[in-house]
Amino acid sequence: MIFEKPKRVRLKGKALSDLNRKIHNRDHNRCVICGAWVDPGKKYHHEPCGINKSDEEQKGVVLCDTCHFQRHNGKNSLEIREKIEEYLKKCYE
């Protein structure tokens, strides 16, 4: 059996800016974890992050700097990931 890697979407320029605006609009420029206001120019967070990240609306969320740092480096990284996944699932059910 052959397993195919999921295709990752990579956007640049206007397409990436438009996607960032859509994600910020969906999330009302608020961190989906703590509710803090986030500047609309701040790039969204990919979930999943790392090598599997993909520039897609249903895979991005707005995070404040603190929650973004915690998602990547904190003791509660797994908890934050689960909250993000739950939030995105509710958005696209």
Q: What residue spans do the PLM features occupy?
A:
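A boundary/linker detector
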Residues: 1-28, 35-41, 73, 77-93
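Short microdomains enriched in Cys/His and/or Lys/Arg
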Residues: 50-66, 84-93
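Histidine-centered nuclease catalytic patch
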Residues: 32-62, 71, 75
